[in-house]
Design a protein with these regions (language model features):
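Class I SAM-dependent methyltransferase SAM/SAH-binding core
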Residues: 344, 349-396
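A short acidic, Gly/Pro-enriched loop at the edge of an enzyme's catalytic core
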Residues: 398-407
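Short, glycine-/aromatic-enriched active-site segment of Class I SAM-dependent methyltransferases
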Residues: 438-458
Length: 504
């Protein structure tokens, strides 16, 4: 070993990655045929956080020596970490041709399929790794995560327990074990697991969020609210934790824990008065005061957070609004022959309505508008819209140059109390005889035309909807009272409405 090589190794072992990199790069220049020097240079770039540069040096090493297993496995992992899943799969498979028992290649290939949400394929590679090396923590924790995604919570708990036994200091293992126990309905076991995670890392806000969920399952609202508040505080007021805390307050209020909720809602408002989620939900819960619409920042932040899991959550709620709107479309336009129209999906979300609206749209005639960039990314992936706009819907309708033959809006008006400006904007953006089909949540609780429910959503009376449509110039074609979704142990009812623009 040369003196420079020894120096490079010592720097790397001491965590002095920049100095190590300088030495390895010099060695690589002096000995361009040494793939191990190139791999070591890549390792330094990786340790310094430059994954792209690391991948470049691993690729150089692979080109120098096609049979270098470290070059291939490190290249495959770097490609995975930089999001190039196709290359990550290719190089992992090449590594396995060199060594069918390469644990890094097997794990990385499993990770590729996990990222693609092909969980059955991911399991295959994680199992191989676990069989080759019994007691391998990485394989056990990955198996636990994958079974959890497959909703096999018993298997997830088994592998999470194994992972925790292998590494008792793993927060990930304990939280995964706790979440699997929650799903299995073993709430005391969940509390024990989350408590162990909190002992290891008392600064992680998500652990307190999980503790809050476990206490909530046991109807221990005092403990649930205190841990939910700790999650907000320890996160420094992170938006996801504000949203979770708002829903926790709502659910606690439904369970008659009003005295606790009021105090926390007021404290929440006092501590974070400028946050749109806090302003909207806190006021709804503490004193019922509200603006005529939910703040755009509140709506945007809520759906940006929920976007990746939005459709899975809706499925669990038996969400029916898109199907109900499709039923109205079929009743109005028929099953087979129907006009081709320019259509706006107002508050398109992830594109649940866009999937069936496409066949009603004229050439390049389906547009979607939504406040949430996160939701629009999910909608774009469906490749059904010709145009997607990130904007508040009333603002878009008031300023758009085109005129639509149809505007559809599923479960969006529940974030608007006073619908007068919206209906006026809809009327202006529709062609003569154009239609709007939408859903609203029913106000069966009082005599107000609309009011802000403790859920943070607005409820509307049927009489108000009918009266305002007629005042705006619409002809009410059809209105039907329907169950829209579940919420906790309750059913949420509302109206599906179709109205046609009259006049010039």
């Amino acid at each position: 070993m040369s003196g420079l090589e020894e120096t490079a190794r010592n720097h790397y072992q001491n965590g002095e990655y920049a100095q190590a990199l300088s030495a390895w790069l010099e060695l690589s220049q002096n000995f361009p045929g040494r793939d191990d020097y190139l791999v070591s240079s890549g390792n330094c770039f990786d340790a310094l956080g430059d994954k792209k540069a690391a991948a470049g040096y691993y690729l150089k090493a692979h080109k120098v020596n096609k049979k270098s297993l470290p070059a291939l496995t490190n290249l495959a992992i770097a490609c995975y970490e930089t999001g190039d899943l196709k290359a990550a799969e290719k190089y992992s498979r090449r590594a396995l041709k060199l060594d069918a028992e390469s644990l890094p290649a097997l794990i990385n290939l499993g990770n590729v399929f996990y990222r693609r949400k092909d969980y059955a394929a991911a399991l295959q590679y994680y199992r191989q790794a676990a069989e080759l090396r019994p007691g391998y923590y990485v394989a056990e924790i990955n198996l636990a995560n994958t079974y959890f995604e497959l909703r096999d919570y018993a298997a997830a708990a088994k592998h999470a327990e194994s992972a925790a036994a292998l590494d008792s200091g793993s927060v990930q293992a304990w939280t995964l074990l706790g979440n699997a126990a929650l799903e299995n309905g073993v709430f005391d076991a969940a509390l024990d697991a989350f408590a162990k995670a909190a002992e290891i890392d008392s600064s992680d806000p998500w652990i307190y969020n999980y503790l809050s969920q476990a206490y909530q399952k046991k109807s221990l609202w005092k403990e649930a609210l205190e841990n939910g508040w700790q999650a907000v505080e320890k996160s420094g007021g992170d938006e996801a934790h504000h949203i979770n805390f708002g829903y926790l307050l709502y659910e606690a209020s439904l369970e008659k824990a009003d005295s606790l909720c009021g105090g926390y809602a007021r404290k929440w408002l006092e501590k974070y008065p400028e946050n749109p989620v806090v302003r909207h939900m806190g006021k709804a819960l503490s004193d019922g005061r509200s603006a005529p619409v939910a703040p755009p920042g509140y709506v945007r932040d809520i759906f940006d957070v929920f976007a990746p899991d939005f459709e899975q959550v809706l499925h669990s709620l038996e969400y029916r609004a898109p199907d109900l709107i499709l039923g109205f479309l079929r009743d109005i336009y028929g099953e087979k022959k129907h006009p081709k129209m320019r259509i706006l999906d107002a508050g398109c979300g992830t594109g649940l309505c866009g999937v069936f609206l496409k066949k009603y749209a004229s050439f390049r005639g389906l547009e979607g508008v939504d406040l949430s960039a996160g939701m629009l990314r999910e909608a774009a992936a469906k490749k059904v819209y010709n145009k997607l706009i990130c904007r508040e819907i009333t603002d878009w309708l008031n300023n758009v140059n085109t005129r639509y033959g149809l505007v559809v809006s599923a479960d969006v008006f529940t974030y608007i109390g006073d619908l007068e400006n919206l209906f006026s904007a809809l009327f202006g953006a529709l062609k003569k005889n154009g239609r709007v089909i939408f859903t609203v949540s029913e106000n069966s609780l009082n005599d107000s035309d609309w009011f802000l429910h403790i859920s943070g959503r607005f409820l509307h009376r049927r009489e108000y909807i009918e009266r305002l449509l007629l005042q705006t110039g619409f002809e009410l074609e059809k209105i039907s009272r329907e169950k829209l979704r579940n919420e906790g142990n309750s059913e949420v009812w509302g109206y599906v409405v179709a109205a046609r623009k009259q006049g010039a």
